Amino acid sequence: MTDRVDISRLLSDMRALKAQTQVFQRPEALRGEGLHNGMRTLEGVEQPTKVPSFGDLMTQAVSKVNETQKASSAMADAYERGVAGVDITDVMIASQKSSIAFQATVQVRNKLIEAYRDVMNMPI
């Protein structure tokens, strides 16, 4: 039960998050060569996909942190019970991953609160 970092999986996760957060998409091909009243027509261009809201992204991030902590706890419990295949190094790595994920979440929360206070203290 090893949970090693797989660089290709990490890169694909990062690409998926980037694709989710892109608000504006450039059309791949513009059809309608000529100008019509000074503007090009955008025939055949796909409508942009629904972009997840900030709240949805935060909910997903907190859920992933929660899953990481649950996995770390389950691995520690398995090690304490003496389950074969669970090594102390894997337990410690999982524990550190969950700790770092939680600390990052707390820092994001602190920055959000600080930004909110800055906005609220701005003069009108």
Curated annotation (Swiss-Prot):
Q: Name one Pfam family in it.
A: FliE
Asked if the keyword NAD belongs to this entry, the reply reads no
A single GO cellular-component term on record: bacterial-type flagellum basal body
Write out the GO biological process terms. Answer: bacterial-type flagellum-dependent cell motility
One MF term in the entry's GO annotations: cytoskeletal motor activity
According to its UniProt record, where is this protein mainly located? other
Which residue spans adopt a coiled-coil conformation according to this UniProt entry? none
Where is this gene product found?
Bacterial flagellum basal body
What keywords are annotated for this sequence in UniProt?
Bacterial flagellum
Indicate the family of this protein. Answer: Belongs to the FliE family.
Could you identify this protein by its name?
A: Flagellar hook-basal body complex protein FliE
Q: Which organism is it from?
A: Cellvibrio japonicus (strain Ueda107)
Lineage runs: Bacteria, Pseudomonadati, Pseudomonadota, Gammaproteobacteria, Cellvibrionales
